[in-house]
């Protein structure tokens, strides 16, 4: 039995000479989540009966400047939702609606008719989508005499209904004079 003690002692000494255990793996580095870009709100189609759509909140304001006359519709102290401009030099009217995107068409609905126009971004800040209308276009008379409201539908934008007030008639008359 005495022979076993030296052997056991040797084995214990050898066991004590083993390499240290490996270092634990480094803690995972938390990477911040990529910023979440909210999806654009879906364009809700109101009922097909557009005269029942709620009117946008705001008032029409008439102004004159070096280019001609301008009617702006929107809430006081905020950017206009809709503009109608008469460029007296070019003898053109421009109907614009607040919004951005690759719009291709604008539909103007009145109590008597509707008309589709090509629309494009104006490049202005804030962003607007606009169409050019000749002063002799019958849609202008339909807008001026529409029964209480006009609807504007622009690709990629929420359709809106705005009141038909005398400022529209003033802009049309300015461009026809």
Residues of each region from the PLM?
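Post-signal peptide N-terminal segment of mature Sec-exported envelope proteins
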Residues: 26-51
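Mid-length scaffold segments of soluble, non-membrane domains
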Residues: 85-122
């Amino acid at each position: 039995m005495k022979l076993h003690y030296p052997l056991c002692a040797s084995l214990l000494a050898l066991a004590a000479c083993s390499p240290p255990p490996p270092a634990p793996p480094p803690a995972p580095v938390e990477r911040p989540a990529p910023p979440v870009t909210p999806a654009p709100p879906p364009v809700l189609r109101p009922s097909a009966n557009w005269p029942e759509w709620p009117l946008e909140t705001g008032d029409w304001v008439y102004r004159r400047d070096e280019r001609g006359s301008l009617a702006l519709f929107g809430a006081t102290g905020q950017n206009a939702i809709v503009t109608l401009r008469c460029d007296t030099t070019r003898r053109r009217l421009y109907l614009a609606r607040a919004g951005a995107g690759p719009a291709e068409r604008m539909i103007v609905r009145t109590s008597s008719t509707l008309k589709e126009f090509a629309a494009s971004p104006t490049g202005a800040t804030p962003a607007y989508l606009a169409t050019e209308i000749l002063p002799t276009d019958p849609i202008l008379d339909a807008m001026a005499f529409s029964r209480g409201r006009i609807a504007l539908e622009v690709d990629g934008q929420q359709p809106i209904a705005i009141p038909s007030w005398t400022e529209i008639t003033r802009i049309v008359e300015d461009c026809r004079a």
